[in-house]
From Swiss-Prot:
Choline binds at residues 121-122, 125, 214, 218, 348, 470. Residues 1-87, 519-551 are annotated as: Disordered. It comes from Mus musculus. Gene3D superfamilies: MFS general substrate transporter like domains. Residues 31-78 are annotated as: 8 X 6 AA tandem repeats of P-S-[VSG]-S-[VIAG]-[HDRL]. One of its GO terms (biological process) is brain development. The N-terminus contains histidine-proline motifs involved in heme binding. Can bind 2 to 3 heme molecules. The gene is Flvcr2. Disruption phenotype: Late gestation lethality due to reduced brain vascularization. Endothelial cells fail to adopt tip cell properties and display reduced sprouting, leading to vascular malformations. Conditional deletion in endothelial cells suppresses the import of choline from blood and results in microcephaly-associated vasculopathy reminiscent of Proliferative vasculopathy and hydranencephaly-hydrocephaly (Fowler) syndrome. Residues 22-87 have a biased composition (Polar residues). It holds the Pfam family MFS_1. This is Choline/ethanolamine transporter FLVCR2. One of its GO terms (cellular component) is mitochondrial membrane. Residues 125-142, 193-199, 260-264, 362-365, 420-422, 487-488 are extracellular.
Amino acid sequence: MVNESLNQEESNDRPAPESEFQMDTSYSTQPSGSIHPSVSGHPSVSGHPSVSGHPSVSIHPSVSIDPSVSVRPSSSALPSTLAQPSGLTHHSSLVREDSVIKVSKRRWVVVLVFSCYSLCNAFQWIQYGSINNIFMNFYGVSAFAIDWLSMCYMLTYIPLLLPVAWMLEKFGLRTIAITGSALNCLGAWVKLGSLEPHLFPVTMVGQVICSVAQVFILGMPSRIASVWFGADEVSTACSVAVFGNQLGIAIGFLVPPVLVPNIKDPEKLAYHISIMFYIIGGVATFLFILVIIVFKEKPKHPPSRAQSLSYALATTDASYLSSIVRLFKNLNFVLLVITYGLNAGAFYALSTLLNRMVILHFPGEEVNAGRIGLTIVIAGMFGAMISGIWLDKSKTYKETTLVVYIMTLVGMVVYTFTLNLNHLWVVFITAGTLGFFMTGYLPLGFEFAVELTYPESEGVSSGLLNVSAQVFGIVFTISQGQIIDNHGTMFGNIFLCVFLALGSALTAFIKSDLRRQRANKDAPETKVQEEEEEEEGSNTSKVPVVSEAHL
C-alpha cells in the first residue's frame, strides 16, 4: 500500500516532478488537447480514463478520496473513480463545482412551494364532486355530467403526458412549475364566469384548464426528490410532495360543503359558490407569484451520488422515445404500472363517487360526506409520511409496497360491508382505515418506480404511472357509478375489491431490483454536507488524499 499526500501549496506553485508522476502518452495536459469521447465530466473539463503513474507503479482502479472532494465518474456508469494527480493541468475549481455532493437548504422551500400549488390544483379537482348534488341542482345537469368535472382531469392527462414529460426533460423543473401554477391560476379565475345556472359549459372550460395544469404537476414529486434531496431523504421528500396533493383533496372534501349550503334559491346559491371561487382564485394567484420568486431549476451541487451519476450519464441528444421503449422492456416496471393504476384508479373512483354513496345511505348528510372524505385523505397522508420515513430507513420497497397493497384490499372489504349498517361513526372508522393504506400507497409507487428504472428520467416513469391511474380511474368511475345506480353501493364497492385483489397478486411478482440504491452503495462514500449560502461564492478547495491499494 502506498499513501501519497499531495501538498496544497506545492501543487499550485509547481508541477509534479517527472520521477513522481508520468503522464500516459494518450493523455494531453494542454488546454487545447482533444477530449476523449468516452468520458463525461464538467462541460469544460474531461479527461482520458486511463491515467498511469510511474512506470514501476500501477495505480489500482479503486481509489479512496477524502469525503470533501468527489471526482466525476466516467460515462460507463461504473462507480469507480480515478484520482487526478496534482501535476495534471485542468480547471480544478470547475470540476469541484460540479462534483461535490451537497444538499441545499433551499430544497425544503422548493418542495413546500410545490406541495402548496399541488394542493390548490387538487382542491379544484374534487370541489364539485364533494357537493355533487348541489351543483346538479344549480346547473340543472345530471350526476354523470358533474362526474365529468372530475373525470376530465383523468382524461386530459392521458394524451398530454408525453409532451409534458418531454418538456420536463427539455426545459427543466422551473419552466414546468411556472407553467403548471399559471394554468392552475387561469382555470380558477375562468370559473368565476360560470355563476349562472345556464353557464355550465364555462365552468367545464375552467375545469379543463385546471386539468391541463395537473399534467404539469403529477409527475413532479419523484423528480423534485431526486434532483434536490440526498439519498437518505428522497422517499420522505417524495411523500411531502405528494402530501400537498392529498391535503388539497382533503380540504376539497371539507370546505365546499361548509361554504356552499344546500339551498334552493339560485341567487343565494350563486353567491355562496362565488365566495368559494374567489378564495381559490386568490390563493392560486398568490402561489403563482411565489413559484416565480422561489423556484429554482436545480441545486448548485448534486445532492447524492446517484444524482451525480445521473448528471454524468445525461446526454443532450438522448432519445426520449428510446427511454420509453426501455421502460416498457422492464417487466418489473410494467407490473408496477398496472398495479399502481389499479390502486390509484380505485382511489379516484371512490373520491368522485363518495358523496353519492354516503347520501344514498344517509340523506341530507352532505357535510358528513365531506368529513368522511377528509378522514380518508388525512389518514392517507399520515400513511404516506410514515411509509416515506420507513423506506428511507429500511429501503424495503417491495415488501412495504406489498404489505400496504394487501392492507388496502382488507380496508376496502371492511368499508364495503359496513357502509350499509347505517352507523355513521362506523363509516368514519372504516373509511379512515381504508384511506391510511390506499392513499398512503401513492408515494410508495412513485419511489419504487424510480428505483426500478434508474437512471431513466423520473418524469417519464412517474408520468407513465399516472397515465395508468387516469385510465383505470375513468373506467372505474364510470363502471362503479353505473353499478351503484342500478345495483346499489355494495356491488359497486365489491367491483373495486376484485381489482384491488388482482393488484395485490401482481405486486407479489415484482422483483426488488433497486438500481438507484445500488448506484449509491457501489459508488465511493461521500460525506453529504449542508450547503451554506455564503459558501457558494467561495473558491477554496481541499486537495484529496489518495490511497493506492496496490503496487
